[in-house]
């Protein structure tokens, strides 16, 4: 359901909870919809450290309950993790006065409940946080922050769901230290594994904001490869002359494709491949997702080059390995020290380029809907919905206008039928009126009386008057 909707509406991103079935290091416990290939699946980490709450290890540790991957066809899951333990939530009681007010203005501590507020744990708490981050990423493009890290420095763009997803995954931190399994048992993890996926969400490592973050940002949206095309290439050069403090080059490729049948053993339909080479060292390829070979399972691929040196140049390759359709669109994101502007108009393509004039914002009908869905016990809870109701209002208004139009057309048709019937009756009656010759033949013969007031009246007028 999510995959097909996102494929049909490529400015849409669904952010869903991975689930809470991971106790005991239970593998492949991420279930639908968290195992959908196009969504951004979110696992739960701890929220703060032991210094604040006893037993808490901090956001670099995955919560014991957070569902684990891989999916049944071997894809990475969850995609990312975010704080999901002891998150303060509303606990309104609609039948009680002041239901949303905590007692005496106090705030509940971890695991504590009180009037109006309560503390909750679960991937259902993590997903809304990531959905909020996704909303900020969308705003970053819509308000043109990507130009030089300030508002309105670039054209207003309507980003694809693939671009928003790639941006968040590209900045995710792989410094996950382990999984808390309770009773002091910590399971070690590795980058791109099935505990934390691509890592811990970090907006400061995902986007460049002047004076706030120290990472350069490049992106290409709405790119397309056709079956049989040679690889597309993109060039980046590491430039630390302006004080950039990023040590790594991170590149992420993401694409949204049509949904696969339930229970598929290989769900990837269109297989794109990402790899990076360093100029002068073309013999060495950096492959994605921690592998030494191409990835033929995931529709998100990430390459991280540790310690990218100042002045070194890299070529990013995106190629179509195997396509089941004629072509495939994709989004590509890179972060690192690039110097100067983070992006220029000639290196960024907007999915909806016809609406990318610098003087205005994106049309409301092309705004995305970001939904955070939580899967708890098989139920899907909508945690956050960013939707422009104008889209739905326009659809409702259009339907209402069409309904009125049909009703009007029906009335007009009924009137036409009524008008057609009226002259037909008169013509028939005129045919019943005897011709002059027939009247002459019938003269002197007794006239047969006809019923109907109108007919009798006409016959009386037709009889010859007596002298």
PLM segments and residue spans:
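Catalytic-core segments of hydrolase enzymes
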Residues: 1-90, 169-173, 247-259
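Hydrolase catalytic cores
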Residues: 32, 84-182
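Secreted peptidase-domain scaffold signal
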Residues: 146-148, 155-159, 176-177, 183, ...
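Single-pass type I membrane protein transmembrane segment
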Residues: 368-381
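Noncatalytic accessory or regulatory domains flanking protease catalytic cores in secreted, cell-surface
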Residues: 118, 123, 187-194, 265, ...
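Single-pass type I membrane-protein transmembrane alpha-helix
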Residues: 379-393
């Amino acid at each position: 359901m999510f995959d097909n909707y996102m494929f049909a509406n490529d400015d849409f991103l669904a952010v869903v909870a991975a689930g809470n079935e991971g106790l005991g290091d239970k593998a492949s416990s991420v279930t639908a919809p968290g195992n959908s290939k196009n969504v951004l699946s979110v696992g739960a980490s701890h929220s703060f450290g032991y210094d604040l709450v006893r037993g808490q290890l901090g956001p670099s540790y995955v919560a014991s309950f957070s569902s684990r991957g891989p999916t049944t066809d071997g894809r990475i899951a969850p995609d990312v993790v975010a704080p999901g333990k002891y998150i303060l939530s509303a606990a309104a009681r609609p039948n009680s006065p002041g239901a949303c007010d905590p007692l005496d203005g106090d705030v509940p501590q971890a695991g504590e409940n009180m009037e109006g507020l309560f503390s909750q744990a679960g991937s259902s708490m993590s997903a809304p946080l990531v959905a909020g981050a996704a909303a900020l990423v969308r705003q970053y493009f819509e308000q043109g922050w990507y130009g030089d890290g300030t508002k309105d420095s670039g054209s207003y763009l309507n980003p694809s769901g693939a671009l928003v997803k790639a941006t968040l995954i590209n900045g995710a931190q792989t410094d996950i230290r382990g999984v808390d399994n309770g009773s002091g048992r910590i399971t070690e993890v590795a980058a791109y594994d099935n505990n934390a996926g691509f890592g811990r969400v970090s907006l400061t490592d995902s986007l460049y904001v002047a004076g706030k973050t120290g990472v350069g940002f490049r992106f290409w949206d709405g790119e397309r490869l056709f079956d049989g095309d040679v690889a597309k290439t993109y060039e980046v050069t590491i430039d630390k002359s302006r004080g950039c403090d990023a040590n790594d080059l991170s590149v992420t490729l993401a694409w949204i494709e049509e949904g696969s049948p339930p229970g598929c053993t290989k769900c990837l339909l269109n297989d794109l491949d990402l790899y990076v080479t360093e100029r002068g060292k073309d013999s060495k390829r950096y492959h994605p997702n921690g592998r030494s070979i191409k990835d033929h399972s995931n529709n998100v691929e990430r390459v991280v080059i540790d310690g990218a040196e100042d002045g070194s140049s890299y070529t990013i390759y995106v190629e179509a390995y195997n396509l089941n359709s004629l072509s495939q669109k994709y989004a590509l994101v890179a972060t690192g020290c690039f110097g100067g502007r983070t992006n220029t108009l000639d290196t960024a393509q907007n999915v909806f380029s016809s609406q990318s004039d610098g003087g205005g914002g994106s049309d409301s009908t092309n705004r995305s809907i970001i939904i955070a869905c939580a899967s708890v016990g098989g139920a899907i809870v909508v945690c956050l919905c960013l939707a422009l109701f104008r889209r739905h209002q326009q659809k409702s208004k259009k339907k209402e206008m069409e309904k009125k139009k049909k009703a009007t057309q029906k009335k007009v048709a009924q009137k036409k039928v009524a008008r057609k019937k009226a002259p037909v009756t008169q013509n028939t009656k005129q045919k019943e009126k005897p011709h002059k010759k027939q009247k002459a033949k019938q003269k002197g013969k007794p006239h047969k009386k006809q019923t109907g007031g109108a007919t009798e009246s006409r016959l009386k007028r037709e009889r010859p008057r007596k002298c």
